[in-house]
C-alpha cells in the first residue's frame, strides 16, 4: 500500500470538507444563514418546502459529496425548519438530496467513467452521463416534493 499516495488524496478531501465546514460556520455566525432563511420564509411555507430539496440537491451537486453538501447547507435547512416547524423533515430532505445528487456531480461522473474505461471501450461520454444523471435527479426532485407535501399535509412529522 502506497501510504504517501493515500495521504495525498486524503489531504485534498479533508481540506475540502474543512473548507465547507468553515464556510458554513462563517455564514452561520455572520447571520447570513438567518437572513437567507428569513427571506425564503417570507415567500410562504409552500414555496419554502418547494425550495428545500433544491437547496439540498444544489449542495450535493456542487460539492460532489453528501457530507460536504450537508456541511455547507444543513445550518440553513435547520433555520428553515425552525421557521416552519418542520426541522426533522427539512434536515432529512437535506441529507437525502445532497447524498443522492452528489452522484450526478462531475467528480463522480469522471470517476465512474475512468473505472468503466478499464473494462470496456463502449462507455458513454461525460455529457451523456451528466444528462442521464440530471434526468434521474429531476425524477428524484419530484419524488422529494411528493414526500414533503404529503408529510407536511398530513403532519406526519412534528
PLM ranges: what are they?
Residues 1, 25-37, 62, 144-158:
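Transmembrane helix-loop junctions in multi-pass membrane proteins
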Residues 1-18, 35-43:
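Hydrophobic transmembrane alpha-helices of multi-pass solute/ion transporters
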Residues 8-26, 138-147:
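Selective recognition of specific alpha-helical transmembrane segments in multi-pass small-molecule
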Residues 15-24, 43-76:
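Hydrophobic alpha-helical transmembrane segments of multi-pass integral membrane proteins
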Residues 31-45, 75-79, 84:
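Membrane-interface interhelical connector segments
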Residues 46-60, 84-107:
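Alpha-helical transmembrane segments of multi-pass membrane proteins
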Residues 62-96, 120-125:
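Hydrophobic transmembrane alpha-helices that form the pore/transport pathway of multi-pass ion
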Residues 99-158:
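Juxtamembrane and boundary regions of transmembrane helices in multi-pass small-molecule transporters
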Amino acid at each position: 500500500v502506497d501510504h504517501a499516495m493515500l495521504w495525498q488524496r486524503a489531504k485534498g478531501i479533508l481540506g475540502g470538507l474543512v473548507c465547507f465546514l468553515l464556510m458554513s460556520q462563517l455564514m452561520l455566525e455572520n447571520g447570513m444563514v438567518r437572513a437567507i432563511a428569513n427571506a425564503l420564509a417570507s415567500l410562504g411555507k409552500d414555496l419554502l418546502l418547494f425550495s428545500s430539496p433544491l437547496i439540498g440537491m444544489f449542495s450535493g451537486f456542487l460539492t460532489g459529496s453528501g457530507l460536504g453538501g450537508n456541511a455547507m447547507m444543513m445550518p440553513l435547512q435547520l433555520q428553515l425548519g425552525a421557521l416552519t416547524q418542520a426541522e426533522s423533515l427539512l434536515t432529512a430532505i437535506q441529507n437525502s438530496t445532497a447524498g443522492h445528487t452528489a452522484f450526478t456531480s462531475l467528480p463522480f461522473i469522471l470517476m465512474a467513467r475512468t473505472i468503466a474505461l478499464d473494462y470496456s471501450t463502449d462507455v458513454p461520454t461525460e455529457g451523456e452521463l451528466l444528462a442521464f444523471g440530471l434526468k434521474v435527479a429531476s425524477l428524484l426532485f419530484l419524488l422529494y416534493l411528493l414526500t414533503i407535501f404529503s408529510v407536511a399535509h398530513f403532519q406526519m412529522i412534528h
